């Protein structure tokens, strides 16, 4: 089991983090229009998976704003903002904040399938059931080429 921390206290994660050099696990997440988005939808492009607990936290909201700025100048790259927030809340946030260069996706519908495959589901602590803050980059061939996990999500 992988570990992270919340405000200095250890938090257990379901499974293990994906590994650099391995094939990215397939996933199905929910878009704002309630349709599905899968790993195959990004085939042939770099995918940046910005994974976080909730847009209702300052640090997570800031990360989405920053990735939105960076995504504007990245050819052949798609940035996915992934949380357990409902698609309606994600859409409201993106509209209010002028976020248009990232795709907000929710892991609410499929019983944490994505979170478990990527090793980011918090299984204890005050944020149990939410996603641990991390970034995964998938290359155009579908391989994980970079992984960052936050040592202490706030």
Predicted regions and their residues:
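N-terminal targeting signals for export/organelle localization
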Residues: 1-30
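Short active-site neighborhood of thiol/selenol oxidoreductases, capturing the structured segment around
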Residues: 40-58
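Conserved small/polar residues in nucleotide/adenosyl-binding loops
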Residues: 57, 148-154
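Structural microenvironment flanking redox-active thiols in thiol-disulfide oxidoreductases
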Residues: 61-102
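Short, internal strand/loop/helix patches
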Residues: 97-132
């Amino acid at each position: 089991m992988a570990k992270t921390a919340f405000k200095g206290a250890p938090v257990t994660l379901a499974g293990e983090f994906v590994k650099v050099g391995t094939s990215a696990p397939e996933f199905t997440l929910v878009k704002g229009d309630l349709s599905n988005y899968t790993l195959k939808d990004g085939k042939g492009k770099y995918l940046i998976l910005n994974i976080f607990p909730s847009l209702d936290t300052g640090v997570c909201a800031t990360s989405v704003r920053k990735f939105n700025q960076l995504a504007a100048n990245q050819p052949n790259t798609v940035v996915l903002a992934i949380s357990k927030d409902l698609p309606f809340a994600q859409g409201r946030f993106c509209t209010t904040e002028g976020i248009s260069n990232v795709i907000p996706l929710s892991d609410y519908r499929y019983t944490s399938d994505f979170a478990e495959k990527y090793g980011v589901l918090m299984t204890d602590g005050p944020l149990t059931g939410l996603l641990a803050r991390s970034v995964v980059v998938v290359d155009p061939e579908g391989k994980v080429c970079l992984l960052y996990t936050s040592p202490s999500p706030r």
